[in-house]
Each structure stands twice: as C-alpha cells, then as structure tokens.
Amino acid sequence: MASVLSYESLVHAVAGAVGSVTAMTVFFPLDTARLRLQVDEKRKSKTTHMVLLEIIKEEGLLAPYRGWFPVISSLCCSNFVYFYTFNSLKALWVKGQHSTTGKDLVVGFVAGVVNVLLTTPLWVVNTRLKLQGAKFRNEDIVPTNYKGIIDAFHQIIRDEGISALWNGTFPSLLLVFNPAIQFMFYEGLKRQLLKKRMKLSSLDVFIIGAVAKAIATTVTYPLQTVQSILRFGRHRLNPENRTLGSLRNILYLLHQRVRRFGIMGLYKGLEAKLLQTVLTAALMFLVYEKLTAATFTVMGLKRAHQH
C-alpha cells in the first residue's frame, strides 16, 4: 500500500502531467487538423498543412488552438491518473526487481482501464468544445452551442442523459492497448539501451518515445477514428445505432467508413495523427524523464522501482 500512496508515484504523476501539457501545447494545431480529418470526412483537403491553412483562412488565425483549455485540462488529469496508476502498480508488482516487457504491458493495460473510466467525460466535453464553431462539409453533423466546460456538461446531461458523457467508452477501453503498447516498447527499448550505457541522452529519450508512439498509433488508429466520432456524438445517426459505444456501434461505424471511403478511410488523418502524437509523445517523455530525474536528485531520493 505504501508503494501506491508514495511520494515517488506522485512525482511520476506530476511529471507526466506537466510533460504532456507542455508537448500538447506545442503541437496542438496538428491535433486540430487530425480531428477535423477524422470527423468531417467530406473535407476535400487531405493533408495536414492544407487542412490547417483552410481552417486559418475560414475561421481565423487562432482557430487551430480552439478548445485548447478543455483539452489541456483533460490531458493533465488523464496523464496524472495514468502515470500515477502505472508507476504505483509497477512499484507494487516489481518490488525492486527488474521489470519485464510482459509486466509493462499488463500494468500499462490496467492503468489505461482506470484512466478511461475516470476521465472519459472530460474527453467527450473537450472533443465537442474543440469542434464547436467549426465549418463542416458534412451535413450530417449537428452544431453545438456550449458556453464552456460546465455548460457543456450541463447541456449533455440535460439533453442526452448522463450516459452520453461516457460515449466512446467501449472503443476507449479497447484503445488502452495504445498506451500499453507504447509503454511496453518505451520501457523495453530503454532497458536495452541502458545495458549498453550508463545514462540516456535527451536525444535517446526523444527517439525512443517517438518510435514507441508511432507503433502504438498505427496499430490502433481505426479504433481512434471511431472513438472521435462517438465522442463528438453530433452525427445524425439512426437511433438504433446511437448506443453507448457498443461493439455493434463500432462495427457499424467501421463498416460505413469502409463502404464510403474504402479501407484507407479507416486511416484518414493518420498522417496528422502520427505527426502530432509521435512528436508530442517524444517531447512528453523527454520532459517527464528530465523532471523526475531532477526531482529525485534534488530530494535525494532513488527511483521507487528499477526499469
């Protein structure tokens, strides 16, 4: 129990949250482009830079940063929960021994499930706020009018029921394999490099973080597309298809996507997603590693568990 409520776990959680917020702020416009490509499938522009130029031209210079605060708030909470859970469980399970790839995957999966169940309502709200006021090509999208985070929560609960705050939970639970795979490769690659050298450089951490995220994102991207559509929740779908992120709804959306756009329709926006998530993850891990190392050094502590 001491491992779960330890100061070391808190340091990891805060460093992870700060790292993710820093990285997402830097690369936020890329996430805006990715989300538009996923949700507004009738948009003619197919590349990241063309979508961003289109958004700036039609909606203003700051439009790529629309919804920044709710996204950053959600990301901060989400990564705090994930890093805290991941490092607490790892410390509890490993207990001073060397970790393994299998253990990293299991711990990452459990941490992901806890994170999804606690933070999905925040992501549903931030997805809608981020797309509010956007000029869509898809006439099936119903516009929203939220005054802020609290008002968005209020309107969603009032008009759609409290269960709507967990829209996309099922694909999100499937997508816990994304961070689990990411952390498995990250920790595994880090262990391999540390066998050959005493300390990792900033470039080492950046590259390892980028490679781990690229693999995880490519494997799980079709489900991420479905997740974005379900979280947005403003498409005019048939009532029987508007279930709470059920397997039936996921299969329906995947089928519709393939029928209308071919198999590559499942990967629409992947370029923007890879560009954004790979760079964001790499920078996040870099900030995270530097912050944890500096904090442990200043406080005269050793890491709670070995990698």
UniProtKB/Swiss-Prot annotation:
Interacts (via N- and C-terminus peroxisomal targeting regions) with PEX19; the interaction occurs with the newly synthesized SLC25A17 in the cytosol. It comes from Homo sapiens (Human). It holds the Pfam family Mito_carr. The keyword Iron does not apply. It catalyses: AMP(out) + CoA(in) = AMP(in) + CoA(out); 3'-dephospho-CoA(in) + AMP(out) = 3'-dephospho-CoA(out) + AMP(in); acetyl-CoA(in) + AMP(out) = acetyl-CoA(out) + AMP(in); AMP(in) + NAD(+)(out) = AMP(out) + NAD(+)(in). The lineage of its organism: Eukaryota, Metazoa, Chordata, Craniata, Vertebrata. Residues 1-147, 244-307 are annotated as: Necessary for targeting to peroxisomes and interaction with PEX19. This is Peroxisomal membrane protein PMP34. InterPro entries: Mit_carrier, Mito/Peroxisomal_Carrier, Mitochondrial_sb/sol_carrier, Mt_carrier_dom_sf. It is found in: Cytoplasm; Peroxisome membrane.
